UniProtKB/Swiss-Prot annotation:
Signal sequence coordinates: none
Record InterPro entries: Flavodoxin_fold, Flavoprotein-like_sf, FMN-dep_NADH:Q_OxRdtase_AzoR1, NADH:quinone_OxRdtase_FMN_depd
CC cofactor: FMN
Keywords, in A-Z order: Flavoprotein, FMN, NAD, Oxidoreductase
Function: Quinone reductase that provides resistance to thiol-specific stress caused by electrophilic quinones. Also exhibits azoreductase activity. Catalyzes the reductive cleavage of the azo bond in aromatic azo compounds to the corresponding amines.
Designated name of the protein: FMN-dependent NADH:quinone oxidoreductase
Catalysis: reaction(s): 2 a quinone + NADH + H(+) = 2 a 1,4-benzosemiquinone + NAD(+); N,N-dimethyl-1,4-phenylenediamine + anthranilate + 2 NAD(+) = 2-(4-dimethylaminophenyl)diazenylbenzoate + 2 NADH + 2 H(+)
Source species taxonomy: Bacteria, Pseudomonadati, Pseudomonadota, Gammaproteobacteria, Enterobacterales
GO molecular function, one term: electron transfer activity
Subunit structure of this chain's protein: Homodimer.
Residues spanning the membrane: none
EC number: 1.6.5.-, 1.7.1.17
Enzyme class: oxidoreductase
Protein species of origin: Escherichia coli O139:H28 (strain E24377A / ETEC)
Cofactor note: Binds 1 FMN per subunit.
Length: 201
């Protein structure tokens, strides 16, 4: 039995293409892997606090006493990291906003990227500590950006996930959704076909 963690990060709730596709992924996965456990965390509905000068002090090893706000941030960081490490498959619904990921997803990453916990520095360079996972990124875009200089989502997510130890990453693209109903429907259809292929593998 595998455990699947789905991270939603769109601000558009039910209107979101990435949310709809991640819901489709969950439906297909449950159909093919009925014994697996699926956890869904909606980072827009339940936002992660923005990392600031006070909160960053809670995430670094220190003997200094923590403020109540820092204690809350550290407890949330511990919870998010434990959840991440407890799952085998990580599904990230990542819409493109202004060429990059959403603020909601970036805030999540800022709380799970912790030296000595999810990665460490060695004499040979950084080493990821979140290993043995597979990641599937479902990314929706209004325009066409794949393999072009305006796609900052794909390299960023590949780099971040690899940095913490997740190197088996597959991408599902839904592009051109702002080009009209016909293009949006094709984007959804192509993305669902890619999801079907991943789920069946």
């Amino acid at each position: 039995m595998s455990k699947v963690l789905v991270l939603k990060s769109s601000i558009l709730a039910g209107y979101s293409q990435s949310n709809q596709l991640s819901d489709y992924f969950v439906e297909q996965w449950r159909e093919k892997h009925s014994a697996d456990e699926i956890t869904v965390r909606d980072l827009a509905a339940n936002p992660i606090p923005v990392l600031d000068g006070e909160l960053v002090g809670a995430l670094r090893p220190s003997d200094a006493p923590l403020t109540p706000r820092q204690q809350e941030a550290l407890a949330l960081s511990d919870e998010l990291i434990a959840e991440l490490k407890a799952h085998d498959v990580i599904v990230i619904a990542a819409p493109m906003y202004n060429f990059n990921i959403s603020t909601q997803l970036k805030n999540y990453f800022d709380l799970v990227a912790r030296a000595g916990v999810t990665f460490r520095y060695t004499e040979n360079g950084p080493e990821g500590l979140v290993t043995g996972k597979k990641a599937i990124v479902i990314t929706s875009r209004g325009g066409i950006h794949k393999d072009g200089p305006t796609d900052l989502v794909t390299p960023y997510l590949s780099t971040f996930l690899g940095f913490i130890g997740i190197t088996d990453v597959k991408f599902v693209f839904a592009e051109g959704i702002a080009y009209g109903p016909e293009m949006a429907a094709k984007a959804q259809s192509d993305a669902k076909a890619a999801i079907d292929s991943i789920v069946a593998a």
